[in-house]
Amino acid sequence: MENNNTKSHSVLLYNTQNIDAQLLKAGFSIRKKEYQRIWKDIQKGSMAKPETHYLIQGVRGAGKTTLLSRLAYEVAEDKKLSKWLIPILLNEEEYGILSLFTFWLRIAEKLAEQDAKRYTELFEQVSKLNESAEMAWELIQNHLDNNQQKIIVFVDNLGELFKDFDEIEHAQLREVLSLHPQIRLIGGSSQLLEAHFDGAAPFYQFFKLVNLKPINEAEMHELLRSLAKQTGEEAVKTIEEIIIEHPERIEAVRRLTDGVPRTIVLLFQIIMEGAKESSYAYLEETIDKTTPLYKHRMDDLSRQQKAIVHAIAMNWDAMSTKEIAEQTRLPSKTVSAQLVKLQQQWIVDKIETNTKNHLYIIRERFFNIWYLMRYGSQTDKRRVLWLTRFLE
């Protein structure tokens, strides 16, 4: 694959929301069931009363951002819906949103961007408020009612957003979403949202959950075919040959990546190259490209969780709680509690044994490879070389 193609895949990976709507739709090859489930609900909903709000959950790279963008574009392009329903697609990272008020301010700004004639005055009015979230929502609500319109807000990294809101703001947002039909929320999160599972939290059992599971063999083939089409006719022929003649190579990569689409896209070139000598060189290049994804994944963790992940990743093979505690010098109870959270964040898998001493392993093996290549010794890197030979 030429450099420009590699670059285009890179953009698709990390800047999905900046891609042209038609290009994104053309490359939308997986997560179709999840898309149809939510899209049909949006289509049939009149929002005469408060509608169901969704939370899309999945590990980083599972396809949440692409799915949210696809839904937002579809609302905007639907002739019937777009007359009264305005899609508000927030950026994957919204560093300017620090409170519920700034959340409403950002929505007012996006409304003004999409329809300056109707909503510029709204944005100006909200901008002049003194940090009052209640007044900000009241203004937005009134302007929407006056224009006989409603909004559907697509929020990636909803968990990060919730962390910045205090308890009062959580309660206020819950009240708005529960009682006001002018707004609907479709969120995404790369970790299980504690607010949804905490019985004492305002958002307990509030969202309809959509879990993005690892893609299966058929979906893997669809993704590879889509990538090949974007690359060229020769790539289409090559990938079809591999699917027919070497399905085991594709299955090995799927298991290695735990079926995470973003990582599979990055490994596309290695799959195409097969048993050529350049395979290991491509692996090194791919390791470098996965750094933004995996470093972000590590940054999401607490200090104790990072230490536990480090111990398991450096070991490669599964470890017991006792072994992890010895390596990290953390109390066994602390390790056990953090392992539960790491499983909820899809970082670690539990391997049950016949005893109480269960084993724990890094769930996505390619993440473990990245960790060894980035932080391991020469011996660790030789392990990766052997693995590459195995894939060939």
Enumerate the predicted regions with their spans.
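P-loop NTPase Walker A phosphate-binding motif
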Residues: 57-89, 339
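Conserved Walker B catalytic segment
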Residues: 131-192, 197-205
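Short glycine-rich substrate-engagement loop in P-loop NTPases that contacts/grips substrate
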Residues: 97-101, 118-140
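Conserved NTP-binding/hydrolysis module of P-loop NTPases
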Residues: 94-121, 228
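Conserved small helical "lid"/interfacial subdomain of P-loop NTPases
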Residues: 212-246
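Winged-helix-like regulatory helical subdomains adjacent to P-loop NTPase cores
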Residues: 2, 250-333, 337-345, 350-363, ...
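A short beta-strand-to-loop transition that corresponds to the Sensor-1 phosphate-sensing loop
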Residues: 72, 157, 187-193, 215, ...
